[in-house]
Regions:
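Hydrophobic or amphipathic, alpha-helical segments that drive membrane association/targeting
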Residues: 1-93, 162-164, 224, 232, ...
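Catalytic Zn2+-binding segment of zinc metalloproteases
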Residues: 120-140, 186
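Active-site-proximal gating segments in proteases and membrane effectors
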Residues: 23, 83-89, 180-281
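Short pre-active-site segment immediately N-terminal to the catalytic Zn-binding motif
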Residues: 50-54, 98-114, 163-166
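Short helix/loop segments within enzyme catalytic domains
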Residues: 47, 54-60, 66-72, 150-221
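Residue-level signature of catalytic and energy-coupling elements of molecular machines
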Residues: 63, 99, 118, 175, ...
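Active-site His/Glu-centered metal-binding helix of metallohydrolases
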Residues: 107, 116-125, 174, 178
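Alpha-helical membrane-targeting segments
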Residues: 21-36, 133-163, 221-238
Length: 295
């Protein structure tokens, strides 16, 4: 099975547009030349708690089975002592996942599994490189822009940022698809509701199909009048994640597909073809991936 059947169409479309930006390769070169990747990792390793079989195994041990099923190396997992519920994946050279104490305290165990699978989805689908680029640009935007005189000017940075945000939103939908291989879309939706700060007593009474329909209604703006499309663009333009009802709708729709059901019920391994030779996941470098049944 071609991995493109797993990747959300909006993700593929946005990534193609992002890669078409002429200055992107030079921009990426500068970001890594300035050591942003190392800076972010050093801050992470000195301020967060690295989890393992010996360090809070009740959290860490949830990660390796997900990675094994996806055929990816197990990344380092860190716990940040922030009360704000959040998680992210970072690191181009050394990939790592961070979950916050607020997230662990807020989510039930099955919901935490969905979040970890979502983060592994970013690794599986090769999102981390562009996530690192986006984080660098939005963290050190002015400094980077000043250093790109003759390469990319201030005026050119805005469309780069917009393209990165568009892709970032779309990539979340792909990662949610990976989460749905391991967890029902309803579980993911409950986790999203908690991350939206919806109180527990409300979540217990919520009809998540109705909540997801709000996401459908919002996305329908894109297919309406020109003015509706502008409203949709204005609502999304500065966001790096889709709205949670949209994500719930997309996850529930994906859950009903044959592809999702097949991935849930069949063991598979990741392969890519290069001159008719199959290589291991960790040897890949921008090649075309496919999913193969090994059961």
């Amino acid at each position: 099975m071609d991995i493109n059947k797993l990747i959300h169409p909006e993700d593929a479309k946005a990534l193609k547009a992002l890669k078409s930006i002429p200055a992107l390769p030079k921009l990426m070169e500068k970001v890594f030349q300035y050591g942003y990747d190392e800076l972010a990792w050093s801050e992470n390793v000195t301020t967060n708690l690295r989890l393992s079989e010996k360090q809070m195994p009740e959290i860490y041990n949830r990660l390796p089975p997900i990675c094994e099923r996806l055929g990816i190396p197990v990344p380092e997992l860190y716990l940040q002592m922030s009360p704000i519920a959040n998680s992210w994946t970072s690191g181009h050279k050394k990939v790592y996942i961070v979950v916050t104490l607020g997230l662990v305290k807020k989510l039930k165990e099955d919901e935490l599994d969905a979040v970890l699978a979502h983060e592994c989805g970013h690794i599986l689908c090769q999102h981390v490189l562009y996530q690192t680029l986006a984080n660098a640009i939005f963290t050190f935007g002015d400094f980077l822009t000043d250093s790109f005189v003759g390469v990319i000017g201030n005026a050119a940075m805005k469309p780069v940022k917009q393209a990165l945000l568009l892709w970032s939103r779309a990539s979340e939908l792909t990662a949610d698809r990976v989460a749905c291989i391991f967890s029902p879309a309803m579980t993911l939706s409950r986790a999203l509701a908690r991350l939206d700060m919806i109180p527990k007593y409300i979540i217990e009474k919520m009809d998540f199909d109705v909540w997801a329909s709000q996401g459908y209604d919002y996305e329908a703006l894109r297919n309406g009048s020109a003015w509706n499309k502008i409203i949709h663009w204005m609502g999304d333009s500065d966001a790096d994640h889709p709205y949670s009802p949209v994500r719930a709708y997309e996850a529930m729709r994906w859950e009903k597909t044959d592809t999702c059901n097949w991935l849930r019920s069949n063991p598979f391994t990741l392969e890519f073809q290069d001159d008719n030779t199959t290589k291991k996941n960790e040897e890949k470098n921008g090649a075309n991936w496919s999913l193969s049944n090994v059961g």
